[in-house]
Amino acid sequence: MAFKIATPQIRFASPGPQPNGLQAAPDGLWCIDQVDNKIYRQDFETGEVLFEAQTDTVHSSGITLGGGYIWIASTYESKIAKLDLVTGKTVAKYDSPGAGVVAWREDAVDAQSTGAHGLEWRGGLLYVASPPSQMIHVMNPENWTEVNRFPSGGLRVHGIAWGPRGRLWVSDTSSGTVQLMETEHGRIFETIRVEAPAEVHGMTIYEDVLWYCDAHSQQIGCLIV
C-alpha cells in the first residue's frame, strides 16, 4: 500500500491557547504558542509544565533546539529567532528564508507576507519549512546562508521531524498528510494520512513515535500508525 492511516491519540492539552510548534528533547516536550508567544516545556507523561518563558516573537509556528540555543519561527515578522536556552530571551533574529505570500492568499486584497513554520536541527544546520515558498530551506546558522532547498511536497507545509535513515517527516495541513522525504531533492518515500479533524501543526518525534500539536483544538498527542 502506498500510504498508511494514522489515528491521533490525545495525550494532554497545551498550556497555551494555540500550540503551533513542537520539539522533543531529553528534558521534556518543548512547545511554542502562536497566540501568547510563550515557550513551554512539558513532561511527556503528565503534561506538567516544567518551564515557560515569554518571547518577543510574533504568531510563531515552529521551534527546535540546536547549537546550545532555542530556535523559533517568528512567522508574522518573517524572522527566525535565536533564543537563550536558559532564559528564553532573544539573542539574535535572522530573515526567514522563503518568506512571502502563501499561494492560497495571493489574490487577496489584504494578503500579507509571512515566514516559516516547522524547524529542525541536524549536523550544525537548521532545516526551515516555509509555506510561502513550499520548500524546506537548509540554513547554515553561522553565516545565515542557504546551503540547500527541496520541495515540501504540498500546499501548506507545517511541522517537520527526523525519521529513519536521515530522512525527514514533513506534515502538510492542507492535505492532512505526513510524508517521509530525503533531504537532498525531496523524494517522498512514505505517506501517512491523518484522520480528521486533527491537524498536524507542530510535529516532533520521541521514542520513535510522532507527536503533534493542533492549534485549533489546543491538544497535544501522538500519531498511532
Regions found by a protein language model. Give the residues of each.
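Blade/loop signatures of beta-propeller domains
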Residues: 1-5
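A short beta-strand motif characteristic of beta-propeller blades
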Residues: 7-13, 48-53, 89-94, 99-109, ...
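Beta-rich, blade/repeat-based domains predominating
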Residues: 13-26, 56-67, 97-123, 153-165, ...
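Conserved beta-strand positions in repeat-built beta-propeller and related beta-rich domains
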Residues: 15, 31-36, 72-78, 128-133, ...
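Short loop/turn segments that connect beta-strands within beta-propeller blades
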Residues: 43-47, 84-88, 140-144, 182-186, ...
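Blade-level signature of beta-propeller repeat domains, shared across WD40, Kelch, NHL, RCC1
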Residues: 200-225
